[in-house]
């Protein structure tokens, strides 16, 4: 009888230590089985699960392995300056007049109304109403009403009403053109404009103006036509 008791006790002890219990730790590497669905057996603690332990992957970006951070070309954008980007320089205190289109100097005491198109000099005390088209000099104390088209010199004390079309010299002090000259025609050399002005057009090149009076169309050197030729 005692041998049977010792035998069953040994078997029960072996089952308790070697066989996995319902929810206990168990031995070996196999995970513990789930608890019984009906709640049978003794209560046991839930299985303790530890996080997986992995060594970090070490690799050099130049050797092509791993995820070595952002690419060297993906640099951050350059931040804007503290005051922002300027869009245009500030205007002067008195504002812009109109200004020459290509490098012309600003007037000292006056202002441009239209400004010369190509590097015309600014007037010192006056102003252009239209301005010469190509490099005409500014008048000293007067002003152009239209201005010569190509490089005509400014009058000393008078003004053009239309101005010569191509490079004509300015009239002498005190005179003025009523209509102006045709293309490539110059003003009289050394002669003052007639007292009454030209009615239609200036005389041809190198022809002197009459001392007094005016042309009706184009008179000879010293007189005028009245409908027939003088003897």
UniProtKB/Swiss-Prot annotation:
Per-repeat ranges for Sequence: 75-78, 79-82, 90-93, 105-108, 114-117, 121-124, 137-140, 153-156, 169-172, 192-195, 208-211, 218-221
Signal peptide (residue range): 1-16
Residue span of region 12 X 4 AA repeats of A-A-P-[AVI]: 75-221
UniProt entry keywords in alphabetical sequence: Cuticle, Repeat, Secreted, Signal
GO cellular component term of the entry, any: extracellular region
Primary subcellular site in the record, as a coarse category: secreted
PTM text: Tyrosine residues can be cross-linked in vitro, leading to the formation of insoluble high molecular-weight complexes.
Localisation: Secreted
Lineage top rank: taxon: Eukaryota
Molecular function (Gene Ontology), one example: structural constituent of cuticle
Domains: entry comment: The small repeats A-A-P-[AVI] are also present in many proteins constituting the protective envelope of other species.
Role summary: Component of the insoluble part of the cuticles.
Record's protein name: Cuticlin 2
Lineage: Eukaryota, Metazoa, Ecdysozoa, Nematoda, Chromadorea
């Amino acid at each position: 009888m005692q041998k049977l008791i010792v035998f069953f006790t040994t078997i029960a002890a072996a089952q308790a230590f070697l066989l996995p219990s319902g929810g206990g730790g168990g031995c070996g590497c196999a995970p513990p089985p789930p608890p019984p669905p009906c709640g049978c057996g003794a209560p046991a603690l839930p299985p303790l699960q530890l996080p997986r332990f992995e060594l970090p992957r070490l690799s050099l970006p130049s050797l092509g392995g791993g995820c070595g951070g952002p690419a060297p070309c993906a640099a951050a954008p350059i931040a804007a300056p503290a005051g922002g980007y300027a869009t245009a320089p500030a205007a002067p205190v008195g504002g812009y007049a109109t200004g020459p289109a290509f490098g012309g100097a600003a007037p000292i005491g006056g202002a441009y109304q239209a400004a010369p198109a190509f590097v015309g000099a600014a007037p010192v005390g006056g102003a252009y109403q239209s301005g010469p088209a190509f490099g005409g000099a500014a008048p000293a104390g007067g002003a152009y009403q239209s201005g010569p088209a190509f490089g005509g010199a400014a009058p000393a004390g008078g003004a053009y009403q239309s101005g010569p079309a191509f490079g004509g010299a300015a009239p002498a002090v005190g005179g003025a053109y009523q209509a102006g000259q045709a293309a490539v025609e110059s003003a009289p050399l050394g002669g003052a404009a007639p007292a009454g002005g030209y009615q239609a057009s200036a005389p041809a090149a190198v022809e002197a103006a009459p001392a007094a009076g005016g042309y009706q169309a184009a008179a000879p050197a010293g007189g005028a036509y009245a409908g027939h030729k003088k003897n």
